[in-house]
Amino acid sequence: METNTVQKLTDILGATKVYHNLPVANLVEMAVKRGEGILTDKGALNALTGKFTGRSPKDKFVVDEASVHDKINWGPVNQPISTEKFQALQQDVLQYLQSKDELFVFDGFAGADTTYRLPIRVVNEFAWHNLFARQLFIRPSEEELAAHESEFTVIYAPNFKANPAVHGTNSETFIVLSFEQKTVLIGGTEYAGEMKKSIFSVMNMLLPERNVLPMHCSANVGKDGDVALFFGLSGTGKTTLSADPDRFLIGDDEHGWSDNGVFNIEGGCYAKCVKLSEEGEPQIWKAIQFGTVLENVDVNEATRVADYDSTKYTENTRAAYPVEAIPGAVIPGVGGQPNVIVFLTADSFGVLPPISKLNKEQAMYHFLSGYTSKMAGTERGVTAPQTEFSTCFGSPFLPLHPVVYAEMLGKKIDERKVQVYLVNTGWTGGPVGVGQRMKLSYTRAMVTAALNGELEKVDYVADEIFGVQVPTSCPNVPAEVLQPRNTWANKEDYDKQAADLAARFIENFEKKFPNAADIANAGPKVK
């Protein structure tokens, strides 16, 4: 049955000049002609997103509809908005789009496993946003396109400004999900990441109903078919660490875990570019080519050379490109059951070990805690690192209660006998301002040892406060780096800082999950 949105949209798309499923070259050409961006010397399209250079979580809403009212975990992440307000907003957005000379439509999929994929349609006011959608979502074959029937529609009108008094929003910016109308409305922001993350939120609602765990993680596979998952918030190293020349990338950010195995929800990568270098991240560097979308990168107008060290517009500079741009990427993005899971955190206190082994209960505890430091630039208003506990390493995108996802994870770890590691890509030798960021070469060496089974052969000691198992040695990593206390000049300062962080873990868990005492027992202990 067609929703009202689809009926109204069909009328509009018939009345306006609409470009359906344009190839990359056409979209790049039109974006440049329309003044939406400029080409770099490598042929990538660089677009500036204005004042919104990150997501706007305070402007995200879910329509409070009867069919989902009792399922949604309502609160600051999933703010309710009435059906009446949604309908008023939708009507005004569609009327606004009707006044446009040109619109752009992409038809594709979310979910590489055909059993679980969601056919989607993305309607854009901007050509470059449509190019972004084409690069980030799964592109259909000609046969699939001919038979394509959208089950969820994203309508993105960045220049439309909401009126909070009329539309029930917090500001002129809005990201509104309606599960009954199968529609996402986005406006008042030009930050393209809102498209990708709104569809991820949709999948986080729909997949668990089919016994599939949706995950904010990257995934890759070794030459022997061994699959690894990397969980972590923005800036913790998911994209970087999963782009491993000795392994094959399944995907860099969003996956589902079913009884069939792991599958990429997307068809592209959305890599952070700040301080990007050919030496540090050769795969990402080479992926920035014709068809790639750069967001908010400082590009020299005269030479068209991108300056990735510059944070002129934001620290949250990005590159969006199809997963095929990574050599050896797995196409379609499906793999077997995972062997190893890595939780990534960027600990700004310099307290957590660079790598430690977790049992199932500890894995569920750290999954529910989702600790990291909020990295500057990925959200508006964050310019210095802050402690953040983001449930399941992805709380902004979870419509259901977090324990639903944690219990699914625990069950799958048990069933598949998966080994879980916690890796700190953050600070060592002290907190931010005193210590330094963990060397990427060390982190890579530790992750490699975890994936190839070398960490199964070494001795471990339990961390006195956090209870996790810390290896006493690791190939290609100095032993003193493995014990964070050893890297601090003043051991008493470390002890105080560690106790402080542990107390924050405990306080966060008790506040959010008062009924999960069995999992809480796997957390840190303060003497």
Curated annotation (Swiss-Prot):
Cofactor(s) required, per the database record: Mn(2+)
Enzyme superclass (EC): lyase
CDD domains: PEPCK_ATP
UniProt-listed InterPro entries: PEP_carboxykinase_ATP, PEP_carboxykinase_C, PEP_carboxykinase_N, PEPCK_ATP_CS
PROSITE patterns, A to Z: PEPCK_ATP
GO CC annotations on file: cytosol
GO molecular function (one): phosphoenolpyruvate carboxykinase (ATP) activity
Keywords from the named record: ATP-binding, Cytoplasm, Decarboxylase, Gluconeogenesis, Lyase, Manganese, Metal-binding, Nucleotide-binding
Catalytic activity, EC: 4.1.1.49
Subcellular location: Cytoplasm
Main location per the UniProt record: cytoplasm
Function: Involved in the gluconeogenesis. Catalyzes the conversion of oxaloacetate (OAA) to phosphoenolpyruvate (PEP) through direct phosphoryl transfer between the nucleoside triphosphate and OAA.
PANTHER family: PHOSPHOENOLPYRUVATE CARBOXYKINASE (ATP) (PTHR30031:SF0), PHOSPHOENOLPYRUVATE CARBOXYKINASE ATP (PTHR30031)
Name of this chain's protein: Phosphoenolpyruvate carboxykinase (ATP)
Organism listed in the record: Brevibacillus brevis (strain 47 / JCM 6285 / NBRC 100599)
Taxonomic placement: Bacteria, Bacillati, Bacillota, Bacilli, Bacillales
